[in-house]
Amino acid sequence: MKKFLLKPKKSLGQNFILSSEITKKIVALAGSLENFNVIEIGPGYGALTREILVHNPKSLLSIEKDRDLVKHHDQLLNEHQGKYRIIEADALHVTEEELIERPVKVIANLPYNISVVLFLKWLNNIKFFTNLTLMFQKEVADRITARPNSKDYGSLSVLSQLLCDIKKEFDIEPKEFFPRPKIHSSVITVNPLPIPKFAVNLETLTRLTRAVFSQRRKMLRNSLQNITNHTETVLENAKLSGNERPENLTIEQFCLLANNVECLFCKSPIAI
């Protein structure tokens, strides 16, 4: 394979899957693809693309930023006319609703350099998707799936798990890719919830969690001072002492805190 591959572009975070066994495991996690439209990001040379097409989706749309790699999909396009299409585009800047109809599943080996930003973009429109089966660098997957009182728990964990049921499925060693990355990868499954687990303004929650986790070793009372001039009132209404550190709070507690930050001038505290 190394003999005919174009030189992978580090600037695009390209690492291609070598194992067909891994592509089979990934696609199987997405469940039945019949009657579903599928989006793939960064198809590369088409290893995952081919496995998706084996499962007979209603349609498959691949989004590839590298023009040189788009050209390598001519054979797949000919073999699956009317079912498969590929566009040259940056996944960060496309509007999925304009490109494909629901119901939609996403199956992707995400480019390392855009994986977090792209996932956050999808979270902001999560109801558009039926489910997502995604490969991340292991460190990011650990952050997404982390629980309170762990070193990986942070803003990404809170936002992801508020909106979705998420499961880390398996890890992948560097030897399974070309070029071989220095880090391990992990596959997670993401199932959007009909409604968030707790009622909250997502913009306020995002601002809050990013602010306090940027100072994760500080007690909550100190880190909240960058967000509100009414720290003690907010803490009292949220039933917190202020001595907690951000990693100690559950998602429910963060939502209660965000609600009270947003409603400083309410006559009574906001409950969930």
UniProtKB/Swiss-Prot annotation:
This is Ribosomal RNA small subunit methyltransferase A. Belongs to the class I-like SAM-binding methyltransferase superfamily. rRNA adenine N(6)-methyltransferase family. RsmA subfamily. InterPro entries: KsgA/Erm, rRNA_Ade_diMease-like_C, rRNA_Ade_Mease_Trfase_CS, rRNA_Ade_methylase_Trfase_N, rRNA_adenine_dimethylase, SAM-dependent_MTases_sf. S-adenosyl-L-methionine binds at residues 15, 17, 42, 64, 90, 109. Its EC number is 2.1.1.182. It comes from the Bacteria. The keyword Methyltransferase applies. It is found in: Cytoplasm. Specifically dimethylates two adjacent adenosines (A1518 and A1519) in the loop of a conserved hairpin near the 3'-end of 16S rRNA in the 30S particle. May play a critical role in biogenesis of 30S subunits. It catalyses: adenosine(1518)/adenosine(1519) in 16S rRNA + 4 S-adenosyl-L-methionine = N(6)-dimethyladenosine(1518)/N(6)-dimethyladenosine(1519) in 16S rRNA + 4 S-adenosyl-L-homocysteine + 4 H(+). The gene is rsmA. SMART domains: rADc. One of its GO terms (molecular function) is RNA binding. GO terms for cellular component: cytosol. Keywords: Cytoplasm, Methyltransferase, RNA-binding, rRNA processing, S-adenosyl-L-methionine, Transferase. It comes from Wolbachia sp. subsp. Drosophila simulans (strain wRi). It holds the Pfam family RrnaAD.
